[in-house]
Every structure is written in C-alpha cells, then in structure tokens.
C-alpha cells in the first residue's frame, strides 16, 4: 500500500468518523453525565466494537451481512431497539447537576459494555467497512498487512474524533447552571438517540 493510497483512506475514514451518529451521541452524553473518565471508558468500548467489526470483515463475515437480508435485518432491529431504549432512559434521566455524584451511578465497566453494544448492533458499520476496505486493498501486495493498516487507522481516527466530541460535550456541560437545563439537555440527547434508532430501523439492505 502506497502512502498516497493510505492518505486517501485516512481522509475518508476521518470524514466518516466526523459524521454524527450513535457513537458520537453516546460519547457526548457519557461525557456530560459521567465526566472524562466515563467518556474514556465509552470511547474504549466504541473502539472495541469497531475492532470486532474490522475482524469480522477481515475473516469474511462482513460479506455475509452485506449479502444476507436476514442477518442484516436481525442486527438492524436489535440496534434500533437498543438505541431507542437508550433514548428513553436518557429522556427520563433526572436533571442532576452534581456530575461527581452522577458519575457514581454507573460504573466505567458498564459504560464500556454499553458502548461496545452501541457499535456492534449497527449493521451499517460492518456493511460499509466490508464495501470500503476492498477499495483500498492492493491485490498484488500482502493483504493481511494492508487490512491491519486500514483497521488500525480506522480505530485511531475514530478514537481521536470521539475524544473531540467528548471535549465538546464538556464545554457544553460547563454552561449548565441548574437542574432544569440538565433535564432539557437529557431530553435533547434522548431525542437524538431515538432519532438515530428510528433512522437505523428505516435503513434498507443495499
């Protein structure tokens, strides 16, 4: 793989990570409600889920999801239901502003697992990776090394972008002055979770 080819993938991966989705929403809500440490656990979970998708694509299971309507639909509806459930929980969250106390309500391990599930149940991610990776793989060169390069690039880029979203969320949290504002913010992010879940439910198999 040439540097130019890798750089083209780097730009593509960056644009994709910057696009707001369930991962970004999950990172921002976790950062606001549980601080940087909670956000770090969430980001680690997202990258673990993304890494699993990359491995599945590497062993050929990504093609299964891109070609099998049943597999795609099962994962799609599971993901949509989970995001909508998260949205309802966020919508109903109390308007607490003591972030130190709020951070104790969920362990970082639980936030980590939640983020893994957010990424794993997104069929569009694995289908897109299955379609994208082959476009940047040079058949005349060792494919495993190229998959590793693309996979590591994808995870590092997404981790940096999600860290940016977490930092942005902390800036937003600094503007919150009372429980009413916090509750309104929880409702806003809850609505976004449900919207993304609804959009995922409406996604069609390519």
UniProtKB/Swiss-Prot annotation:
Query: Per its UniProt entry, which superkingdom is the organism in?
Result: Bacteria
- Name its cellular compartments: Cell membrane
Q: Name one Pfam family in it.
A: LysE
How does this protein lie in the membrane? Answer: Multi-pass membrane protein
Instruction: Spell out the GO cellular component terms annotated for this protein, sorted alphabetically and separated by semicolons.
Output: plasma membrane
* One MF annotation (Gene Ontology) recorded for this entry: homoserine transmembrane transporter activity
Q: Where are the transmembrane segments?
A: 5-25, 45-65, 68-88, 117-137, 148-168, 182-202
InterPro entries reported in the protein's UniProt record: Homoserine/Threonine_efflux, LeuE-type
Query: Which keywords belong to this entry?
Result: Cell membrane, Membrane, Transmembrane, Transmembrane helix, Transport
Q: What does this protein do?
A: Conducts the efflux of homoserine and homoserine lactone.
Q: Which family does it belong to?
A: Belongs to the Rht family.
| NCBIfam families per the UniProt record, alphabetical | 2A76, PRK10520.1
Q: Protein name, please? A: Homoserine/homoserine lactone efflux protein
Naturally occurring in which organism (per UniProt): Salmonella typhi
Taxonomic lineage from the root: Bacteria, Pseudomonadati, Pseudomonadota, Gammaproteobacteria, Enterobacterales
Task: Point out the gene that encodes the protein.
Answer: rhtB
